[in-house]
Amino acid sequence: MTKRVALEPAFILHRRPYSNTSLILELLTPNHGRVCALARSARGLKSRYKGKLELFSPLLISWSGRSDLKFLGDVEANGMPYLLEGEALLCGFYLNELLIRLLHHDDPYLRLFHHYQNTLEKLVNGRLEATLRCFEKQLLDELGYGLPLSCDVEMKLPFKPDQFYQYLPDRGFLLCEKSEERDVFSGKSLLALQEESFSDESSLKEIKYLMRLTLNRLLGKKPLKTRELLF
């Protein structure tokens, strides 16, 4: 039986040409997660989708189909587009690439959908680096790979800002002396990440490295194209 979904909130993460006049879209939705859909004749001169299939625009989208590739139906605007420019636009592309690489099709991501929309708004108005770090943390949490930020792994004591902790993948953060050991982070930075408070530039730099370290384990050997262009 063909499954039909009517006017689901969505963002387009990616679009690519298909055949002579069509497009294949990667969508982010709250109740169906990542969805791949074929927009037939979307590039035709008289297409009903003309001007509607833009990235970073809140949409209401209908689709049908039983396979992994759905068939796009009606598309309506669901708010004003987020007008990203310059580095903010690159950040938006980075978010989209992360989601395409890490999300499975047809898994609901209600909170992540709202995190994504809030992040687009912050990219228009706010600090780019802090906004990206916050989204990366939220993404890891939603995927079940959130960092253990409540205490150190052995003593089970809360992080202290003036102490240092070595990150051990699959275990957590181990209290240590400040040294040349790899993957050592200040308690100050870990507390900032825990609270999603990124006002200190030195902590922000450490958090960026920690997020990259963690995400790389999920992404595998294939690098993100957008990461090469950012900062």
Curated annotation (Swiss-Prot):
Top-level taxonomic group: Bacteria
Protein's UniProt keywords contain Transmembrane helix: no
Gene Ontology BP annotations: DNA recombination; double-strand break repair
A cellular-component GO term for this protein: bacterial nucleoid
Keyword DNA damage carried by entry: yes
Gene3D superfamilies assigned: Nucleic acid-binding proteins (2.40.50.140), Recombination protein O, C-terminal domain (1.20.1440.120)
Keywords assigned: DNA damage, DNA recombination, DNA repair
Function: Involved in DNA repair and RecF pathway recombination.
Annotated family: Belongs to the RecO family.
Identification of the protein by name: DNA repair protein RecO
Organism: Coxiella burnetii (strain RSA 493 / Nine Mile phase I)
Gene: recO
